[in-house]
Structure formats: structure tokens, C-alpha cells
A protein has these predicted regions:
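Short, ordered beta-strand-loop transition motifs
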Residues: 1-2, 49
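ATP-dependent small-molecule kinase catalytic core of the GHMP/sugar-kinase superfamily
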Residues: 2-36, 115-188
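Anion-binding (especially nucleotide phosphate/pyrophosphate-binding) glycine-rich loop
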Residues: 40-106, 113-124
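Generic hydrophobic alpha-helical membrane-span motif
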Residues: 107-108, 139
């Protein structure tokens, strides 16, 4: 294999506001959110290889199962692909903290594999099936996210935006939050 190495930060996703509008028949919730991507997050490196391999390092590596990782699921979206890659994730984004770490990781890996293999990105429909908020993570500009996360529009913003992120260490899986959300908690 040659010495090609592609790398990128995988930024956290911060919902500056998040309104849950209602629940759809398919179980997903319709959202309205303003999303920012501060320049902090995980680090991902990709090298050519014969197979798809994932290694995880970093202070949070023990909390993240390799086999069920969205990164590996994302790599399978390239249908009929015979290429491989060694993918290295340095995990810094807290898990189950509402910061979109898995979705951001998947988005970055999709972009890097597309570039490494010189193939088009999978369809947005396939990407949404993998994770509803992965499409918004494909571009780090300030965005308004609607629908289940698949309807995005860029927001013009000049200047700096300061955000303080605090994590008390409690895990709060997003799917559990939405599962326990009752209609009287929906935004008007």
C-alpha cells in the first residue's frame, strides 16, 4: 500500500436551540434546531488497506464498542466497494452526551473514504437511514436543521460565538430522551 494518509477533526455538534415539533408515524421526531460545530472533537486518520479496520485510542476508547461503531456502518454504505482502509479514531467527544460524536465520526469517515477511494458519497437517503443527524454533520457551517435532521439550510453569521460546554459525566443516550418524550413536552 502507498503512504497516503487522510485526516480530519470530527467536530462536536451543538444544538444552540432544539424544538421538538411532533412525533412521526415512523417513530422519528420532527425537529427545528440551530446547529453549530465548534472546532473541538475527535481526530480521525485513514490509510489505504486491503480490508476495513478500525482502531480506537484516546481517553474514552474503553467506552466505545468497536464492532457496533457508526464508522464501520458508514464504510458499508459504499455499495459494491472492494477497497479497504485502516481507520484510526482518537476519541475525545464524550459518549451519550448529546454532542453528535458518532454522527460526526460517520460523516467525516464518509467524506474521507470518498476522497481516498475516488468514489461519490452515498445518497443522502442512505446516510439518513444510518443516522438522522449525519447529513447536518457533513458540513460544519452554522445550519438550521429541520425534519428528522435531513432538511438543512445554512445560516449566515459573522463574528465569534462563545460556547461553554459542561459534562457531569452522566450518560444521556439521545434515543432514550426521545423515547421518553411525551407530546405535552413538544414545542408549539
Amino acid at each position: 500500500m502507498n503512504n497516503i494518509k487522510l485526516h480530519s477533526i470530527s467536530r462536536v455538534k451543538v444544538n444552540l436551540y432544539l424544538h421538538v415539533i411532533g412525533k412521526r408515524k415512523d417513530g422519528y421526531h420532527n425537529l427545528d434546531s440551530l446547529v453549530a460545530f465548534p472546532n473541538i472533537g475527535d481526530k480521525i486518520e485513514i490509510y489505504p488497506s486491503k480490508n476495513i479496520n478500525l482502531t480506537i485510542t484516546g481517553r474514552l476508547k474503553k467506552e466505545l464498542p468497536t464492532k457496533e461503531n457508526l464508522i464501520l456502518k458508514a464504510s458499508k454504505l459504499f455499495k459494491n466497494n472492494k477497497n479497504g482502509a485502516d481507520i484510526h479514531l482518537n476519541k475525545n467527544i464524550p459518549i451519550s452526551a448529546g454532542l453528535g460524536g458518532g454522527s460526526s465520526n460517520a460523516a467525516v469517515v464518509l467524506k474521507l473514504l470518498s476522497k481516498l477511494w475516488n468514489v461519490p458519497l452515498p445518497s443522502i437517503q442512505d446516510i439518513v437511514l444510518l443516522g438522522a443527524d449525519i447529513p447536518v454533520c457533513m458540513d460544519w457551517r452554522l445550519q438550521r436543521m429541520q425534519g428528522i435532521g435531513d432538511n438543512t439550510s445554512f445560516i449566515s453569521f459573522q463574528g465569534n460565538l462563545w460556547i461553554l460546554l459542561l459534562n457531569n459525566g452522566d450518560k444521556t443516550p439521545t434515543n432514550l430522551i426521545f423515547k421518553n418524550l411525551s407530546p405535552n413536552n413538544f414545542s408549539d
